Amino acid sequence: MVYSLLRPLLFRLDAERAHGLALSALKHGPGCRASPAGPLATRVAGINFPNPLGMAAGFDKDGEVPDALLGLGFGFAEVGSITPLPQAGNPRPRLFRLVEDGAVINRMGFNNGGGAAAARRLAARLGQPGVVGINIGANKDSADRIADYASMAALMAPLASYLAVNVSSPNTPGLRALQDEGALVALLDGVLAARGSVAGVPPVFLKVAPDLEPGDIDAIARIAIDKKLGGLIVSNTTISRPPLASRHAGEAGGLSGAPLHDLALARLRDFRKATGGAVPLVGVGGIASAGQAWERIRAGASLVQIYSAMVYEGPGLARAITKGLEALMRRDGFASIAEAVGSE
């Protein structure tokens, strides 16, 4: 109710400024405790999630408010993408609301304060309850991007519930080429070696693009199984452009929100088939309701994430979705989220 009154005011502001105000409100707000485990609790990649709904990477790029996000009702929060060195990202404006389409286009370019600052911030919350994943990336001008990912894995592994390797942002030139089979094997070998193999190290998830050919999907699935990845996050934003009504439709960057829904769902089903259920999947892209989250779970997602829908629906969306998921799980006769995964 409160957000419905605030939204017209926020939408008069530049999208990036409004995002900054939202971060500030969470940082200085009263805060709430992380959600306790309940009927939606699920175990994925050795991690106990109080519910399967997460905040996707991109909202909290520097790990400033993970606990505040958990307090909104999310079962987990993914911070980042974080790169070894600070970088400003692409020139502004670089974030656009496509209101008529329920969508967002961004070309942020991995803007963040760098690994050292984020690590200090995240180290200060160690011991707090809640699942916090850390999404890692490479600097735009790096001479050795694989070394960037490896150094970030080593730095963040002690601080993360899981690591998410982002090779699918369309806003860093050449980054998506790391999804090619040979490059991806070398990258993951570097990340896994840097993370270590002793008990208690966080699982590694890989975030992939929706704009993949069938051969790419099969290769990534084989690699994920071979490298024993904790999960595949399906998917990042798309560079494709379905028909859009907004005046910002022609902006360069990654498209997210409602127009991504069908593509992301199709890609999730592709990865479910390609992996045979051997690797947990995280469904993300165009989810804005409990029904859509449930659809993604039934299609094979062990976990789901949202972000763009929060822009339009506000901070109450997480609790609305989890409440709806409980009702849908009961309606369809499932005893747990895990039982429903891939049941379509």
List the predicted regions and their residue ranges.
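Short beta-strand/loop segments at the ligand-binding rim of alpha/beta enzyme cores
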Residues: 47-54, 128-136, 196-212, 273-283
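Active-site-adjacent beta->alpha loops and helix N-cap segments on the catalytic face
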Residues: 85-94, 115-117, 123-125, 171-202, ...
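Active-site beta->alpha loop and helix N-cap motifs at the rims of alpha/beta catalytic domains
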Residues: 95, 101-164, 169
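Catalytic cores of alpha/beta
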Residues: 62-69, 150-151, 212-226, 273-277, ...
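Active-site glycine- and acidic-residue-rich loops that bind
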Residues: 138-150, 177, 183, 206-226
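Alpha/beta catalytic cores of nucleotide-metabolism and tRNA/nucleoside-modifying enzymes
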Residues: 1-34, 92-96, 101-116, 120, ...
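Glycine/Thr-rich beta-alpha phosphate-binding loop at enzyme active sites
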Residues: 23, 27-28, 32-35, 170-183, ...
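Glycine-rich phosphate-binding active-site loops on the catalytic face of alpha/beta enzymes
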Residues: 73-87, 167-169, 231-241, 286, ...
